[in-house]
């Protein structure tokens, strides 16, 4: 055969077999190639395919491959970064829009931020890629070593089955390194060796491994064998298992890994058991630590990595500590336990130093691993905490820097802290393991936390050591530890080997009882002996519960339950807790059966009862039954409240550390109605008190939910001075006295477990209801209602004696008129009054309308006049003096009970001498409204006349000058300009203050607190008014003293309508002397007339406020405009405070006349209850209050007679004076019916005649003087001439009186303000000057005045029916407005009709002098002023007609 050239490859020259190179031969046929040649050629063609793989797998090519991979990855990353940084220019803004200078900056900053963010992302991605590349590199290295024969330590032994091995995979596969996988292949790689730090903890000496460190491998040390704790193989960790250290004293049930959330359910299903202690040694070398770092670094669960290192360190550290220095020793064989490891052949690890690892490198690796694991742990924890913000850590997180070193780098083994023993010393079963794993799995906030519970262990009775038992280590148990039943013999723990920490024996002083852990409650597992654990912070703090305990050696420490119970509570639901209650009771019975030794009594200063980590129901106690009680109590509390970690039992459940009571202090009422025996006296005292207080305080937050309701019964053994610890409900109202302070204030809010919320709510409601009922029974009105804006401003004095306010009777239909504007504190008082008046008027117009006539007077006078029981009348807003139903005797009680009406109203309604220390504020509208009903009930004795006025005043309000200084006392009198009857309410004030019996009557009607009540009551007593008035007057005469309140005008008027009462209250019985005549006139009036008048007054009840301009300096600057219907007084000083609709046409002249006569009438304005300072007539003020009050025993008598005379003359002048004020007369004439006017005229005439017969003309001159003083409203010329004419004819006086009495509604409508002011001033002056002696007149005089008034009414009735009626009424109003006519004329606008109807005597005779010309003059003015009768005047007129009929 010729030489053939076989091509071996591209560009490759073949070799001739002979070795000679032959030029390419000429083409030959292919037949020359034999089959062998083809085969050879084919074989050689395959060689290039093998060479790359060989090159790739060649160890020498590994660096090149690594470089290539890294370079490619880096290139990709850089390219990605470049692409991110490359960006197009932003689009230019629209042409029509200018870009601000800041926009480019913002865009640039935004770009820079985006670049930074993208760069960071790229860096992260790069790091991940690098990690993956490194992992791949490690994988390649291991593979190459296997192929190249390197790493003999990793080659499996000849006959050893590998079984489960850990096969690392790239991180991208989302499978953590070390995931357990079945690999039957004998060429499978062994898992990475255990971390280098573990090697550092081993005793010095060569380290050998019997086989690949896997689930079948065990360690044997060249030195003495070390006891190791069993560990499980979590799925997330490289399958590295540290063999447990067997215990020579017997097997022990395996325990779960520490309760970490990351560990739950992450087990390989293998049960950890001790490893055989004897096995052939196999000299193996640990693999390089780098693989360990990579595996750990790429682990999906760094927390587990950290835990593994910690566990290993703990295991080895404990073993080295127990042995001191490691000595060569073989572990005992435990074939039965070795079977769990799947290796029938025992194997051992020879402990020794890792000489192949440099100490510095090892230390660095350890630091890096620890930092990385800690960082990831914190990151995961923060992430989970953010996911569960409501859950907070119960203890301090484990800090790797504060723990003892995990690994001992030095050649000499260092002694780690001796193992701690668990307080409960119980063995935990698999079920408990599972439960606790689930617990920590459910509590992400507890991840990898070193939750430790402080356990006080004393090796001797005097020494105490605080040890922290990490809860995550509590699960580990020592093999061979005998099980111990939970009993009082906890201190009798079996002796441990010398190399193990002996369980600490409990001192006899310790309470043997201890709350069983929740796990025990759930699983009824046995208590386990102490378990070694890492020593944590030395301070005795239960980080799980946050309760600090004293380290003092003076007090014996107690075994405190570990924190795992409290940690589990957040996840335990009520039903679950209920299910485990039986076990709790059983365990508590078993554990707490032993008696407790005597404990010191003193309580540690650092005791924090709030955070006492004691399970309710498991309180330490010597007696089992009591513990049963406590257990049941705790059960109910747990059912209703929740976990015990936050629940504080009642008093007894929380005991200070040094104060364990032998018996529970008390038991919850809902659980057991009977109280258990109280704590021994040794534990009584301050400490106990504090504990009780703390218990209730802590349980207070549950009381609202009905969670905890406990009532501490009397404990004879405890300090009585400790005070009650029961929950006080609704004790905020300290104003209530007497009956209001009842046992219900101390009723403990208890809730039964059946329905605690409902029970608690019912208790609260019952308490509140009882309180309100008590207030209602006592006549107290709720604070929000009882106080008007005036009362809110003035302090309500509390009477020294426990005076009960009278009951509040509602007026007409049980409705009490309450001023609800008090809440509007931001409003000015004047504005508030205006609003109230408008509201009331609106109600009257739309609701009442003309139905006032249908109203029937109520006979409130239920008893004789009596002296007020208390010298000082404090009119409480809630006082029921308002009620008309109350008898007169009760009125003084009200007066005594009532706080002062006005701010500074220090008036005393005592019969001795009521003194008004300050300006009297207008009574609250509620009082007015309430008083209105008893309009007819005025103090009959002293205020017979005022009664008549109240009827007339009923509808009208009273305006009260802020102050009326009578006898040096500032009175805030209110001029009650009621429907035609501006009758002064002097009677109440003077009578009540002056005389005992008389004083109380007067005080009722006139007293600032309840001036109108007595009058109203008297007025309401229609049938027996005269007799009662006479009796009252007599009584007043007997005990009457000159009241400091001189003139209370309008009080009597409001008595009938309630406005009278209000006026009296506001005026405070001021100037009762001036009022008596008016009051007597009211008394003299017929019941029907009084009733009608009262209705009219209540309807109209308008208080005219004189303009400040018109007011004279002598007059009080602010007259309260009061609506009789509402009883509201407006402090405004201007007429325009009231709307035009509210003001009557006669109000303007009234205001004028009032302003004119106001000076003179300051003290004498009885009809209107208008109390002026009396600056107009100083003499009037000074003698007024004392004179009028002192000489006049009964205000009514004095007022009737004296006012009659005084009013005659003043009215004469008034009429003349009123001639100038036709507006008032016209308004009155139009407003009142002819019949009413005639009646009023007749009454006035009669009264004037009587007065003239008696020769009571001085008032006229006095009034004339007053008129001269008041040029605005009254013209002395006309007033004088008319008075003269009236005096000559005698009719004008009657007419004036009629305008006063018969036209109370009429005059009230026409010239309420003018006449009221004039009358008040004139009456005050008359009372001071001349009527003072006449106050002593008895009811006979009143009757006589009554007859006079009636006669006077009859005279002017004709005129009133016709046009003359209007004229005369106008004249009378003018007279009333005039200083002389004012005594009764000023009230005349308000009271004239009421007075006529009630008592003609009410309108003083001074009006008789009014000449017909005066009325005529007034008529045109009235017509011009009003143009027509006011709607309210029309109603008043209709009322008058009824009265006349």
Curated annotation (Swiss-Prot):
Membrane topology: Single-pass membrane protein
Biased composition range(s): Pro residues: 241-260
Keyword Transmembrane helix tagged: yes
Biological process annotations from GO: cell differentiation; spermatogenesis
Record's compositionally biased regions (Polar residues): 664-681, 906-915, 1148-1165
Region (Disordered), start-end ranges: 90-115, 169-262, 411-430, 460-557, 592-619, 637-761, 894-966, 1143-1242, 1254-1280, 1378-1445
Superkingdom of the source species: Eukaryota
Keyword Membrane carried by entry: yes
Entry keywords, A to Z: Differentiation, Glycoprotein, Membrane, Spermatogenesis, Transmembrane, Transmembrane helix
Basic and acidic residues bias locations: 101-110, 1202-1217
The protein's name in its UniProt record: Spermatogenesis-associated protein 31E1
